[in-house]
Structures are given as C-alpha cells and as structure tokens.
Design a protein with these regions (language model features):
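N-terminal signal peptide c-region/cleavage motif recognized by signal peptidases
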Residues: 18, 22-24
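Mature extracytoplasmic/periplasmic domains
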Residues: 324-345, 510-514
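Long beta-strand-rich cores associated with HINT superfamily self-processing modules
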Residues: 511-536
Length: 536
C-alpha cells in the first residue's frame, strides 16, 4: 500500500490558509462562519452533482421546485403546476423575481437552463429526461411534453437550478463548465442567481463570502446577514476552530471527536441517519484496466474476481473500527429509508478464504496489482475506509496502490468529463429524487452517449445489463407502488447476482454546531444555512 506523499504538502497548505482566513473573519450574531472538509470547486451550478456543492449553490441559485425541511417537494421559481394529461405538464412561473444583477426572471431563462443542463460538460444531464420537450407558452408559463408518463418528474428536478440566459450569453458562459476543466469559466468564478444570498467574494481554496439578498422574493427565515465559508481539510484544525469559537458550524465532525465536542459546553454534534450509500466500484467496461499489473485483459470482467473482492471486504470491521459504530452496513445501493423492500436483501458473508479460492479459480492465484481512487475530503472517514479496504484485499493477494486525493482532483479524474479514468474506486451516492429509479438509471444503467447520454452518467465503472435498463424504464412509468417495488427488486437482484458493485454502508450525519446557532439537519446532508439563526 502507498498513499501519495504529495497529499501531505497539500494538506499543510490548506491548514495554513484556513487559519489565516479564520483570523480575519468577524464574530457577529449576523455573521455565521461555516467550515467543511472540502472546497467549493465551481460556482457553475451544472459542474458537479455533489451534495456539499449543491447545498452551496442552493443559497444563491434556485430551481423551479425545491425541498422543504422534511424533504418534501415544494414550489420555488415555479409557483404551481398541473398535469394536463399524463405526458403533458404545465408550470406557472413566479412573477416579479429578479436575478442578483437585476435581470427579470422569465420563461426564457427556464428554456435556456433546460438546454444548458443537458449540454456536454454538465454533470446534471440525468436530472432532465431526454424525452422532455420544453415549450414556452408565455413569459411565465412553460409546458413540458413527454413521450411517456413520468410520475417522478419534479422529484428528478431536485438540484437543477435556473440560470440567467442574458448573463450567461454576455459572459461567454452558455456552455456548462465540466468538472475536468483546467481553466475556469466566468460562471465558475461568479454567480447570478435568484436565491436568498448572493456571493460577495469567492477565493477558491480560501474563502467564500455570502451576503443576504435584500430583494429575495420569499419570506426569510434567518437573521443572518452574512455567511463566511472556509474549507478546512484537517479534521483536527476544523474541530479546534469550532471549539475555540472561530467558526460556528463544521461538517463533518470526525467520529472520534463527537464525544469531545458534546462535552465542550460550547458546541454540540447533530447526528442522524444519512440517505447516502458508500460503495466500491470496479471498471467493468475496458478490455484492459488503466492501472493494473494485468495486461491484455480486465480481471473484473470475470464475475469470480468481483465476488472475491466483495467477500474480502469486512464491512462489520469497517463499521466497528473505522466508523466507530456510526454506520449501517448495506446490502443494496440505496438507503433502506428510500426502498421498502430493503429488508429482503442480505449481504454475502465476509469470507477471505472463499475469496482467495475464487481468485485462484479465475487464474490469479497470486493476486494482482491495481490502483484505487479515493477522495480524502468528501465522505466521513473516506480515506480511512479505503486504507482498510487496501489491507483487507492484501490478505487475498491483491496489492492496491491507494491514490487518495481532495475531491476536486478526484472528481475531475473519475467522472464523465474526465473520461472515467479509474480502475477501482470509492464513491457515495444519494439519489437526488429520493427514489430507487435514480440509482438504477444513474449508477447501474448502461452508458450509451449516442442513444441516451443521461443513462449511466454516474456509472463510473461502466457496468451494463440490458435487463436492468428494461426494468428501469418500466419503473419510471409504473404508478402502482406494489408493482413498482417488485420491478425495482428484480433489477437489484440482477445487480447483486453479478456483483456489479460492493455496497458498504450508509454513513451517519455529524455536524458540529455552536450553541449560539440553531439550524435544520436533513437526511440528505445538505447544510442549508438559510434556515439558520444565530444569537450571541
């Protein structure tokens, strides 16, 4: 096992930068200072479908719909809607809304955003079904025409945020900024939304300052005038900043520090189950792995190798040692809260001896070498989980070179814009629609850019079974809940039989919050501070 040593220098630089920034942040009942382990990569709301990034963007941009504190879909820039028939939706847009630069919000912005979000470079193409045709009825009415019924259409739109057409055109930002971009676009460094806050300044890797939007169309639920966001990669520095009062909110709190924060008398940890599933994936599409000692073929195309990896991973040990009990081992690629038949599935037992035998049968009695991609500032104890997996695979003869990177570099490498450059990886997924269809379509769907560029968009390893695609299409249009759940079950059963992925667990939420602050914690782990209040 080897973790790239360059990470140390990057981490030190991040810590030093964070300390300098914090010292300059004002302490006030109207200023909330928030720190996260990861940075805000881009202000372009279509660059990265990642919970922390979406939460940041949702302070300044808005969608036609949004989710309330209980995760229910509610109106936002669309004040109402109705279905004229099962394939014809009509949306009535909110009048009198202004973008932060004063431009009026109209149907033209929705039409533009519907095209931009589906354009090359967007990480949100699957949020809008490819058969959806947008028609402008008038300046404040939009029709959406579908080829077939879609009862979860507006749930799929969660995370799709509306942009100002005029502003994008004027600033050469008609095309979305891909996650793999090495040169920032205007939209990646500036924002112009309709949301409750606007961004006064943005220094990537250092600090982003949000200011309250006095012209927001809705009724504010916060007493905040400013939010100062600072990325602090170091867990120890992040916790120290909370306990010293330098910041008011941190996410996540390291599991080992939860008791200390709760005992501090100045802060507490908000915990709860998260809807995110953490899992391992393998490159199943290439004929030869990009990063492996095996040449001329791909070991993962043999189901015995995939089964061996699955049975070599001890999720109970990860739960006990790495997650300190704050995780729930999973047999599925979806949280049990989102699928009622989850309890009908069980994980294959941890069995390293059987795993070793399977590798031998597959022609790898001495194992092989490969590289594992892992973020080190995205999920709870993500790098530690990967290190544990490396040790477990070593027991069956597989030598893993662990490449643990900050999420900016990680996602730029492994996502679609970067060419899915990974052989073995750790990822987390919360279905934006809070529905199993999202998992089957985005994570387990066959990639086919020519036929449907949205299917399998987040399927980094290229797993493909056409029977799952057929079932997924039936799931989308089925309105009978019992029949729909059975279709979902059939699809998951196929994926499990083929060892398409290795689900690990649902992680627990852990937000560190000053006793001066009250906020709402949702199970999707979006830190939405426009509901927060602070008292000195």
């Amino acid at each position: 096992m080897s973790v790239r040593q360059s990470l140390f220098a990057a981490a030190v630089g991040s810590i030093v930068g964070s300390i300098v920034t914090l010292a300059a942040s004002p302490a006030s009942s109207q200023v909330l200072r928030y720190a996260n382990q990861g940075d805000l990569k881009s202000l372009d709301p279509y660059t990265l479908k990642e919970t922390t990034t979406i939460a940041h963007h949702s302070h300044v941009y808005e969608g036609l719909v949004t989710r309330d504190k209980e995760l229910k879909i509610v109106p936002a820039l669309a004040e109402s809607w109705e279905t004229l028939d099962p394939t014809h939706w009509r949306f009535h847009l909110r009048k009198g809304v202004k973008f932060h630069n004063g431009d009026p919000f109209t149907a033209d912005d929705v039409m533009f955003s519907a095209e931009r979000v589906r354009a090359t470079g967007s990480n949100f193409t699957s949020n809008i079904p490819p058969d959806a045709k947008f028609v402008k009825v008038d300046d404040y009415t939009i029709d959406v025409m579908l080829d077939s019924p879609n009862p979860i259409l507006i749930a799929q739109w969660d995370g799709w945020l509306i942009m100002d057409k005029k502003w994008c055109v004027e600033n050469n930002s008609v095309a979305p900024t891909p996650a793999s971009a090495t040169t920032p676009s205007y939209a990646s460094l500036h924002e112009n939304g309709t949301g409750r806050f606007f961004i006064e300044s943005h220094q990537p890797g250092v600090k982003t300052v949000f200011k309250i939007n006095p012209n927001w169309w809705g009724k504010s639920e916060t007493n905040l005038k400013e939010i100062d966001f600072t990325p602090i990669a170091s867990a120890a520095t992040r916790v120290a900043a909370l306990l010293s009062g330098e910041v008011d909110v941190i996410e996540p709190v390291p599991i080992q520090d939860i008791e200390r924060v709760n005992a501090s008398g100045t802060a507490k940890v908000l915990t709860g189950p998260e809807l995110r599933t953490i899992f391992l994936g393998m490159d199943l599409s290439r004929d030869e792995l990009l990063y492996s000692s095996v040449k001329g073929k791909n070991p993962f195309k043999d189901v015995r190798v995939r089964e061996a990896f699955y049975k070599a991973v001890d999720v109970d040990l990860i739960q006990k040692r790495v997650m300190r009990g704050l995780s729930t081992p999973s047999a599925l690629m979806i949280a049990p809260q989102l699928y009622p038949l989850s309890n009908e599935f069980t994980r294959p037992k941890y069995d390293p001896d059987a795993a070793k035998k399977l590798l031998t049968e597959a022609g790898y009695p001495d194992g092989f070498e490969l590289t594992m991609d892992c973020p080190n500032d995205r999920y709870v104890n993500d790098s530690a989980i990967c290190q544990a997996v490396v040790g477990m695979l070593a027991r069956i003869g597989v030598k893993v070179d662990l490449l643990a990177q900050p999420k900016q570099q990680y996602f730029a490498k492994v996502l679609k814009p970067g060419g899915y450059k990974t052989s073995f990886f750790l990822l987390g997924w919360t279905p934006a629609s809070s529905d199993a269809h999202n998992v089957l379509h985005d994570i387990m769907g066959c990639r086919n850019d020519e036929k449907d560029p949205t299917r399998g968009e987040a399927n980094l390893g290229g797993y493909c079974n056409k029977d799952i695609d057929t079932l997924t299409d039936k799931v989308l249009v089925e309105t009978d809940a019992a029949k729909r759940n059975q279709l979902i079950k059939q699809a998951f059963e196929i994926g499990i039989k083929e060892y398409s992925y290795i689900p690990l667990h649902q992680q627990a939420l852990a937000w560190g919050v000053s006793n001066k602050v009250k906020l709402t914690q949702r199970a999707d782990n979006e830190v939405l501070l426009y509901w927060a209040t602070k008292q000195e």
